[in-house]
Amino acid sequence: MSGVLGLPFLFGVGLGALVLAMTSLGQEGKSLWNLAALPINASMLIRAKIIFAVLVSTIGLGFGAVVNVLLVGFSGYSLAAFFLLGITLIIVEASLGVAVGSRFPDFSEGPRPKFVTVTGSIIGSVIGIAVMGAILSPIGVALVLRFLYRITIALSLALSLSVVLGTFLAWASYRLAIRPVQDFLVELPA
């Protein structure tokens, strides 16, 4: 039961990864022209942006794990499930963030740059929350069945379904990001 209390941390870490990845391409600003001169392709740039967002967001996941162990008393299984779900969510949200950020970048520089258009940030936030809900839904269904109806479904099965769904969504988001990044890398003068 204590594992349920870790879900708000997962949502926070997931949204952090989403926002960080969404803004990562727009942060390049005019220095994006430098990328055109480098021997990199779109998939390399996308992977670099995803890896950066994953590494930074993993710090928040570790903090959430420490808080849950100290305050809630996570068991070993709950902690392992928390990390597995957290890493899955971070990778999916970072991939989704780069996909959205590549379609709605804002390269303008000024006193308050946005890095991603308002439309893109709204679309990305709504889709990001929906994706987090979809990934966590097998766990939620298993917990509801267990506590309300006394039907026991192995949480490891629900966790596996969440990870498989997350892996597919991360791959799909990565693939969706490639074409827009290729397009604006080709359009830049070398």
Task: Give the ranges of each region predicted by the language model.
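Hydrophobic alpha-helical transmembrane segments of membrane proteins
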Residues: M1-S31, N41-A190
